C-alpha cells in the first residue's frame, strides 16, 4: 500500500517501514529480543556489503565496530550527516543498531604498550609509539567515542525524545597488571591495588564524558582486561566507585573455559549488564598437551584444551543464559560475536542467528497455575 502511495523504490519503502518496526525496549514487558551481529570480525567487508549479507542471514541489526569502514568515531563525533548516512545503509537492508564497539582503542588505555598494539590501533592513536603517549591518546579517543555514539543514536530513525535502549559503547580497558596474573614472582595485594588504581585514574575522565553524553560503557570481561572473571569485575566496579556509566558487555565464551560460572556472572551484576554477546566456546578438548593458558598455540590447533565455536556448537548453556537474562530484566539485543576457526563464517553466522532466534523467548506474564484460581476463570 505504501508503494502504491508513491514511494519510488524499495529503499524508500524500507526507510519508511523501519521506524514502525521498533519497539520500546524499556517497556516492563520483555519481548523476544533483536538478534544483531557484531561487525568486528567482518571489517574486511564494507558496511554496505556486510549489511546486505547480514540481512540475508536473518539478522535484525548490527553492532558496529569502530574499525574498518563500519563506524568512524572522528566523523560521527562532529557530523550529523555522517551518522544519518550510517543509518541509511542499515535501513536500506531493514537493519537497526543499539551499540557501537571500541575494543581495540580501549585495549590501549591501560595496557603495557608494545609493538603488537601498532597493528590494532589507528595511526593517530599509535603516533610515534611512546607507551604513555599512546595510552593518553587512546583515552582521549575513547572519550570521544561517547560523543560519537550519542550523535549516532540521536540520528536513529523513529527515535522519540528518549532512547529506546540505553546508548552503549562496548569495549576493552586493557590492564597494567595482567602480566602478573600467575602471582609469580610473589605478588601481594598492594601490587594489584595499584593496577586497579591506575585503571580508575585513567577511566575517571572517560566515564565523566560518558556521563555527559548519557552513554554507558560496557566492558567485555575478558582475559587481558582489568576484569576477567566475577571477582575482578567486582573489584573494577569498586575501583570506579560504582560509576553508573560503567557496566559490562556480557560474553560467556570468555568465562566458561576459565571455570567461571558464566550464569552466576549475570546474577552477580543484574543492574550492570548493559549489553550481551552470544558467543560460544568449548573446553575439555585437545590431546592433553595444552591447558587453559593455550600453550602458545594458535586457534584451531587440535591440541588445544579450548577454542571458540559457532554459537550452539560449543559447551555454553545458552538456555540458562536466556533464563538469567530474563530474570534480571535485560531487554536489549542478543548480539552474536561469531568466531570459529574451523567453519566458514557465512555458514556459521547464519546458523548462529537461527540458533539464537529459536532459543530466545518472551518471559511469562502470569503464573502458570493462576488459571486454577476461580477468580481467573
What is the predicted function of each stretch?
Residues 38-42, 65-69, 102-105, 174-176, ...:
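Active-site beta-loop-alpha junctions enriched in small/polar residues
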Residues 54, 62, 90, 100, ...:
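Conserved, mostly hydrophobic/aromatic
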Residues 33-39, 62-64, 97-102, 169-171, ...:
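Hydrophobic faces of well-ordered beta-strands that scaffold small-molecule active sites
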Residues 61, 100, 182-315, 364-376:
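Acidic/histidine-rich catalytic cores of soluble enzymes
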Residues 23-24, 49, 53, 92, ...:
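Active-site acidic/histidine proton-transfer and metal-coordination neighborhood
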Residues 43-54, 137-148, 258-266, 318-320:
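Short, acidic/polar
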Residues 65-87:
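Glycine-rich, proline-tolerant flexible connector loops at the mouths of alpha/beta enzymes
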Residues 50-68:
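Catalytic domains of carbohydrate-active enzymes, especially glycoside hydrolases
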Amino acid at each position: 500500500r505504501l508503494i502504491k502511495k508513491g514511494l519510488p523504490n524499495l529503499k524508500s519503502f524500507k526507510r519508511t517501514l523501519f521506524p514502525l518496526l521498533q519497539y520500546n525496549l524499556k517497556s516492563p514487558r520483555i519481548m523476544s529480543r533483536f538478534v544483531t551481529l557484531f561487525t568486528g570480525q567482518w571489517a574486511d567487508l564494507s558496511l554496505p556489503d556486510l549489511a546486505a549479507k547480514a540481512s540475508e542471514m536473518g539478522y535484525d541489526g548490527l553492532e558496529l565496530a569502530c574499525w574498518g569502514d563500519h563506524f568512524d568515531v572522528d566523523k560521527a563525533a562532529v557530523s550529523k550527516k555522517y551518522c544519518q548516512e550510517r543509518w541509511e545503509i542499515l535501513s536500506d537492508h531493514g537493519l537497526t543498531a543499539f551499540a557501537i564497539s571500541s575494543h581495540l582503542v580501549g585495549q590501549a588505555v591501560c595496557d603495557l604498550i608494545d609493538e603488537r598494539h601498532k597493528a590494532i590501533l589507528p595511526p593517530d592513536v599509535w603516533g610515534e609509539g611512546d607507551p604513555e603517549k599512546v595510552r593518553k591518546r587512546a583515552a582521549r579517543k575513547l572519550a570521544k567515542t561517547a560523543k560519537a555514539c550519542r550523535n549516532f543514536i540521536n540520528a536513529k530513525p523513529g527515535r522519540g525524545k528518549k532512547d529506546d535502549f540505553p546508548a552503549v559503547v562496548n569495549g576493552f580497558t586493557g590492564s597494567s597488571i595482567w602480566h602478573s596474573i600467575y602471582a609469580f614472582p610473589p605478588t601481594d595485594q598492594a601490587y594489584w591495588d595499584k593496577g586497579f588504581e591506575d585503571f580508575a585514574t585513567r577511566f575517571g575522565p572517560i566515564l565523566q564524558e560518558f556521563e555527559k553524553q548519557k552513554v554507558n560503557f560496557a566492558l567485555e570481561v575478558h582475559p587481558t582486561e582489568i576484569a576477567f572473571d566475577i571477582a575482578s569485575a567486582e573489584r573494577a566496579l569498586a575501583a570506579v566507585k560504582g560509576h553508573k556509566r560503567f557496566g559490562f558487555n556480557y560474553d560467556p565464551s570468555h568465562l566458561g573455559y576459565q571455570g567461571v560460572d558464566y550464569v552466576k556472572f549475570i546474577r552477580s551484576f543484574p543492574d550492570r549488564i548493559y549489553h550481551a554477546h552470544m558467543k560460544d566456546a568449548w573446553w575439555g578438548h585437545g590431546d592433553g598437551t595444552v591447558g587453559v593458558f593455550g600453550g602458545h598455540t594458535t586457534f584451531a590447533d587440535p591440541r588445544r584444551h579450548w577454542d571458540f565455536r559457532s554459537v550452539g556448537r560449543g559447551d555454553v548453556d545458552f538456555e540458562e543464559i536466556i533464563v538469567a537474562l530474563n530474570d534480571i530484566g535485560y531487554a536489549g539485543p542478543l548480539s552474536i560475536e561469531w568466531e570459529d576457526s574451523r567453519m566458514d563464517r557465512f555458514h556459521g553466522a547464519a546458523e548462529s542467528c537461527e540458533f539464537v532466534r529459536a532459543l530466545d523467548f518472551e518471559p511469562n506474564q502470569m503464573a502458570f497455575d493462576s488459571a486454577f484460581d476461580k477468580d481467573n476463570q
